[in-house]
């Protein structure tokens, strides 16, 4: 009997192969076991309710795809339904300005076409699945050369420029949310992203504590002492994923600079800082990954990313 394993698991999603003939833990076998009679298929502009669909025939041999099963989530009260809606709504919004370039900047990709509609996701009985291009290597798992590191910076900054041009914030930029895929570095996991014009979503604090500036949380009413407590909890929970970072000299250096920065921002509040939070996260990634891989990084470029936060390295 075949063994099997899931590819990765985060707070919101569990990733698995769409189809793997050598593994019995994949999307194909889940559908085979559950045998749903009715499924909801999600296109970018249309949702289809399909009954008695021979779904296995659409999944079989799709070994160039992975599937993200949306979970309830941890720590923060949530639900799989809400998390799925958040991610699909964000995906549809970025599709509006990326359109045919979406696969260049993201791993989001339709697995099949049904009734002339490209299908990007599927659900049944509160089970939710989003389809993605099959790629595995996230930044913390890559041994960079200088040329490859420079390419990563260029690729991701190009994505951030496009998001900022369209007033969109990914809001959860970190090492395991950037992936190397077909000679391109792409941002993944869009469930926390939002349009800066969305007043409702901008009222809530979301995103990773370690790669977000404390002022973001303070500005939403979270006292710094409580931020420090939550940060401590998340470090404990994510320790296996982030221990590579906690040992870095640059991590300790940036902790001091960030403390000075948040005190300055509280004393003299900045205007329109929200649109720069992804830049701050990206600057930290560049600094930490450079030390981890013993590489140089473009100091002037990073200082420019950090400028709105009054940080100079």
Q: Which positions does each model-derived feature cover?
A:
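ATP-binding glycine-rich loop module of kinase domains
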Residues: 13-15, 28-29, 36-106
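Conserved N-terminal boundary motif of the eukaryotic protein kinase catalytic domain
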Residues: 19-31
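Conserved hydrophobic alpha-helix
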Residues: 159-163
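Catalytic-loop of the protein kinase fold
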Residues: 165-180
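C-lobe/activation-segment region of protein kinase-like
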Residues: 186, 190-297, 304
